[in-house]
C-alpha cells in the first residue's frame, strides 16, 4: 500500500521556503528549536480568532526573534493604537520564559484567504462545531477556493460524522491535484473540530497550479538540473 507524505514537507527547499529561518551553534540549537515549537503552539490558539493562516520565524545572532503573522484580519491583531499586538508580545515572552529574548511581532496581510489551506480547514472545523452538515461545509470551502482562483482543491473529514457510532472518512475533490509533482504549488493544512460526539479531523489540500523556474511566485526556492 502506498504511503502518503505531507505535501508541505515534501516541497520544503524545492518549491516552498521553510517557515523558520535561522542558524545556531550546536550547543544552542536544541533550545532554539524548542522555543520555535512553543511559538507555533502559542499562536495556534489564536488561529480562528485572528484568522492566522501562516506563522514564520526569523532569528539573528543577537538573540532577536522576528515572528511574521500572516492574517486576513490585520486590524484585529494590531488592535486600537497597536495595544493588542503589544499585549500579544508580552504574553509570548512570558510563555517562552526567556527574558533575554527580544521578540518582535510583524503582521502581514493575506490577500486571498480563500486560497489558504489552513483558514479553509479552520472554517470547515468551525462549521462542524456549529452542527452544520459536513457535506455542505466542505462544498462551501471548495466553491470559495475555486472562485478565488485555485486550480484544484481536495477536502476530507474523519470521525463520527453526524454522530454515527462508527467513524468514517468522507471527502470531495475538484480540479487538478498533482501531489507527486514537486513543481505543483500545493498548500496543505489540518484542523480539529471538537463536537459533542468527539473530535473530527479536517484536511484540506489547495492547488495553485505549477511553479515554473523564473516565475516570480517561486517562493525563494529553485530546482537544479543535473
UniProtKB/Swiss-Prot annotation:
HAMAP family: Ribosomal_uS3_B (MF_01309_B). GO terms for biological process: translation. GO terms for molecular function: mRNA binding; rRNA binding; structural constituent of ribosome. Residues 39-109 form the KH type-2 domain. It comes from Mycoplasmopsis synoviae (strain 53). It comes from the Bacteria. Binds the lower part of the 30S subunit head. Binds mRNA in the 70S ribosome, positioning it for translation. Keywords: Ribonucleoprotein, Ribosomal protein, RNA-binding, rRNA-binding. This is Small ribosomal subunit protein uS3. Belongs to the universal ribosomal protein uS3 family. The keyword Ribonucleoprotein applies. The keyword Zinc does not apply. One of its GO terms (cellular component) is cytosolic small ribosomal subunit. Part of the 30S ribosomal subunit. Forms a tight complex with proteins S10 and S14.
